[in-house]
Amino acid sequence: MSGNTRLEGPSPQGTGRVPGLRPPAGQSRGKLVFLGLCLVLIGLNLRTAFSSFSAVLTEIRASGTVPEWAVALLTTAPVTLLGLFAPLAPVLSRRFGSKRVLLGAMVVLTGGLLVRPTEWGSAGHLPGLIVGTALCGAAIALCNVILPSEVKQDFAHRLGLMGGLYTTAICASAALGAGFTYPVFQATGEWSAALLFWAAPAAAVVLLFAPVAVRAPRARAGADHGGTNVWRSRVAWHVTLFMLFQAMTSFSVFAWLAPILRERGIDGASAGAMVSVSILLQMLGSLFAPTLAARMWDQRGINVTVALMTSLGFALSILGPLEFVWVWIGLLGLGQGALTAVALTMIMLRTRNPHTAVHLSGMMQGVGYGVGSLGTLIVAQIHNTTGQFALAGWAFLAIGVGAVTFGYLAGRRRNVDGAG
């Protein structure tokens, strides 16, 4: 493998900025602020499709309109789609321009959220749920990949700040879907109305972002900023495997933390409160971690620290003494939010131009989400085989070793690309 470039000279991240980099030419402060707002609002829509479905899953099952095999499909397919469609983002971005692809993805996401709760005549809700979920997964995959390269392109002078804001928005998106979907169901009495609700904020972002995307310069025909094949870069693989182990843990926490706490004897209300606190702490961790990472000479220390916090917090939530469960939840929440944020920040800190950033983002999220989704299946298989979650705690300690190892390697002060 090749493409490993050691960085020389004074720290480019010493103050959370990259010295010598200024806002893009022709971009006024007001335009940059508005663009930053749009990117954050896009982030706020990237997890509601997942968490809103989980919030009313009991009601969907009780309605009898969706068979159990479809429930399994609808809960696991979205994460798989994130991995399958991520590699398409660099191709589309090169052809149409990244902002136009972002806009198109948000249009598709809005369409998916509109289709998902619709009833298709005698076929019922199942076709709409499947088609809508597929559209949402594909659209979110494209946004996941392009957002970091957009930050790299337009906010290279504020990587830490913008990285923190958009990753916090993604964490907040999961919290919004989990927290507001059930109240909408209670108000309307229809789970389909509760799911349909989330098309409104997505449509609002489309209207807000459309003028920015339409006025953005088109990608130059045949433009290829030359050179770096991220799939042959050792640094790119270190970053990708760091993302993979992060994703295995994060998606497992998202899917299984509440059932794990319930099985340990914690009542439903308390388990829900613990999950909510964990999500709030994730937001806090994701807000500050990118800025801290960008200010460091290299990121080995922060990568290892947050990987240890996450794996220990999750394992102890499964295996540790219950009298300290709030400590384990706090450790997990802060660690997981920071781990997700620094993994995504590696895209910007390990590349020198937006072209390489979008290719690295497609690689690490394609592999990371595609393979990382197996984490939820590992937990399910362990529980189905043993009847309990205890073995999963040991499994995620082993996964934590992988996150620590590749977090250390990804954190070394090297770039994927030598150009730029």
Put a short name on every predicted segment.
Residues 34-68, 86-89, 144, 253-258, ...:
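Extracytoplasmic
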Residues 51, 79-87, 174-175, 279-287, ...:
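Residue-level signature of mid-helix packing/kink "hotspots" within the transmembrane helices
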Residues 53-54, 234-286:
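Extracytoplasmic gate region of multi-pass secondary transporters
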Residues 84-126:
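Conserved MFS/SLC helix-loop-helix module at the cytosolic interface between two early adjacent transmembrane helices
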Residues 132-168:
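Cytoplasmic helix-loop-helix junction between adjacent transmembrane helices
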Residues 157-158, 164-214:
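Helix-loop-helix hairpin linking two adjacent transmembrane segments in secondary transporters
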Residues 299-343:
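C-terminal transmembrane helical hairpin of 12-TM major facilitator-type secondary transporters
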Residues 354-390, 396:
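A late C-terminal transmembrane helix in Major Facilitator Superfamily
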